[in-house]
């Protein structure tokens, strides 16, 4: 098999994880401590969430209209800036939390909290310092963290 054929097959492979589609902008990206990857991309009217192992088909892929997401921003979260992107999939709610240091924007912490009724909360921890969060790309409903828990 020649190089062109391999490249074509890779392009045609079913939805390999991690690459915003043409016309989308990266909002959030992080490798997890379990060797997987989380990515959130902003399309013109929707936000797309993808989770799975790099180079393999996504284990989970959600696409919801911008209005289904809430972006919370807070200055002065400890010694940094905090951002949460909150959304639901059925009865399950997801919160992507990101905090960056005021003095060093490469010093970041992030995780994803998953809440399901009747189950213990699950957490996906991102690798420290390897997280990207680009708030200016978000078209979700915006609010301050001080406003309390969002009501869906």
Region spans (language model):
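Short, linear, compositionally biased motifs with a strong N-terminal bias
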Residues: 10-12
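Cysteine-centric segments in proteins
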Residues: 19-152
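Bacterial N-terminal signal peptides that target proteins for export
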Residues: 1-7
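N-terminal signal peptide c-region/cleavage motif recognized by signal peptidases
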Residues: 14-16
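Absolute protein N-terminus
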Residues: 1, 18-19
